[in-house]
Regions:
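Ubiquitin-like/PB1-type beta-grasp interaction modules and other compact soluble beta-rich domains
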Residues: 1-71
Length: 72
């Protein structure tokens, strides 16, 4: 049995479970996203990239990750 406590969040419109204590930087790491190529909206507000490691996710948070893609 898995004793690690988890919380539910909404990520890009889909429900996900993550470990308690994860911050935005941790979330990007497990999703294998480059911090320099994304913007994160948390509960309707754009999160400050400089504070990703200080913004901890809470139960029922709504997270939207937008990835920048270059083109021509």
């Amino acid at each position: 049995m898995n004793n690690l406590k988890k919380i539910k969040i909404q990520l890009n419109g889909k429900k996900h479970q993550i470990k308690i204590g994860y911050n935005l930087k941790d979330l990007l790491k497990i999703l294998k996203k480059d911090n320099n190529k994304v913007a994160i909206e948390l509960n309707g507000e754009i999160a400050d990239k400089k504070k990703y490691n200080k913004i901890f996710l809470k139960k029922n948070d709504k997270v939207e990750i937008v990835q920048f893609i270059g083109g021509g």
